[in-house]
Amino acid sequence: MDDITAPQTSAGSSSGTSTNTSGSRSFLPTFSNVGVGLKANVQGTLGGRQTTTTGNNIPKWATLDQANLQLWTGAGWRNDKTTSGSTGNANDTKFTSATGSGSGQGSSSGTNTSAGNPDGLQADKVDQNGQVKTSVQEATSGDNLTNYTNLPPANLTPTADWPNALSFTNKNNAQRAQLFLRGLLGSIPVLVNKSGQDDNSKFKAEDQKWSYTDLQSDQTKLNLPAYGEVNGLLNPALVETYFGNTRASGSGSNTTSSPGIGFKIPEQSGTNTTSKAVLITPGLAWTPQDVGNIVVSGTSFSFQLGGWLVTFTDFIKPRAGYLGLQLTGLDVSEATQRELIWAKRPWAAFRGSWVNRLGRVESVWDFKGVWADQAQLAAQAATSSTTTTATGATLPEHPNALAYQISYTDKDSYKASTQGSGQTNSQNNSPYLHFIKPKKVESTTQLDQGLKNLLDPNQVRTKLRQSFGTDHSTQPQPQSLKTTTPVFGRSSGNLSSVFSGGGAGGGSSGSGQSGVDLSPVERVSGH
């Protein structure tokens, strides 16, 4: 497939660029047609009018002032309390400390109205039942609230061009790095336990399924969100989140009862201690001019976002089980926050994602870090001198740590329960109960073969011709698992993708793993 390195003009010409093998003109993503993260999503979704979410008894979402989108924090500002009824912020670090916006402390008293501080938004708080609260005090107290107090409408979608932008990182190219950034920043995979339980417990440690044993017994137990989804909600503007209570030192058990995210939780020196991770995304209505100074070095690239210099290490071609994000404050006066490190090795490393013809996000994850961490914890538990009955055991290494999953929305987590009288009980009507669950996880050598097929020029060329109806060959197609291949087209100002795929032959195997049907995605021609 020909290498495309320069964007084409609206007339279809390009500078030093050849057409793709299909013979049809393609339009490369440019800074004008790659979505601008949160701002483009909000404007395109709400369009200056009220939007109603699906489900019974769900209130309309008030229209956002498009001139003040910087006040909206998307997935929300988490303000967990130390104990029930406590008025303090258990996590200490304030929103303004992480973002540099405003000068207030983000107290729950409602007196702070600094720009960028979501605690100053008194009309954008929603409880678990979807009821809008009119004051900060109402929205940050009580047991029936979600941990996120500023959640977006459930129908927000990521930028339409992010699958295309993602594919442009296969070359160590600064333009492609920025295309990737523009289309994907704000869709960083964040693995968070589901919230909004009926019993108001919000987060449960047992909801986090990462063990190799669970994968063997039931592949659908893995609590993996699709790319850029948190609790089934897209993550366009999650600015800061916390690990919550971490596991006690040497115990090897996860004692998280408040939020836990799927990156490696560091061991702490004592019980009930907390640590945090800061995620910088386009939540404050950033524009193309806000992102600059992109530097590509080896397998890493850096860029400036507002007052931060963000560096992705080993991101263009990540090592197994390793992904680093370094945030460096450009304001030298903030010595204590000059450098923040995201977990260098998450529990699962993202390997690729696409959208099938049904609109479902399919992705590949690397679990080497998961099982390595578990083996280390098991070994520590077995040799711990503080435990008299230590029974740790190293988990067996999986023969292939790549896991393929098709994600779908768990309908049972978003439905209204009915009482005996036929009346609808609204306790389960929260739009935040959408939860993405893996439909199937493939972890066999069949996946390896399918990924290799993606890189086979002959396979790519053949499938592209078939997609455009130019290949009349009767050559039988390989029966191994095929992954998707994007082709760039133009549709109503955005890019559309053509994905090829087929089913994995052979049906179900004795291990309970069956083939995955990846039907071709049809090309959209909306112009």
UniProtKB/Swiss-Prot annotation:
Residues 82-95, 128-148, 468-495 have a biased composition (Polar residues). InterPro entries: Adhesin_P1_C. It holds the Pfam family Adhesin_P1_C. Residues 9-26, 108-117, 248-262 have a biased composition (Low complexity). Residues 1-26, 76-148, 248-269, 468-527 are annotated as: Disordered. Residues 500-513 have a biased composition (Gly residues). Belongs to the adhesin P1 family. This is Putative adhesin P1-like protein MPN_500. It comes from Mycoplasma pneumoniae (strain ATCC 29342 / M129 / Subtype 1). The lineage of its organism: Bacteria, Bacillati, Mycoplasmatota, Mycoplasmoidales, Mycoplasmoidaceae.
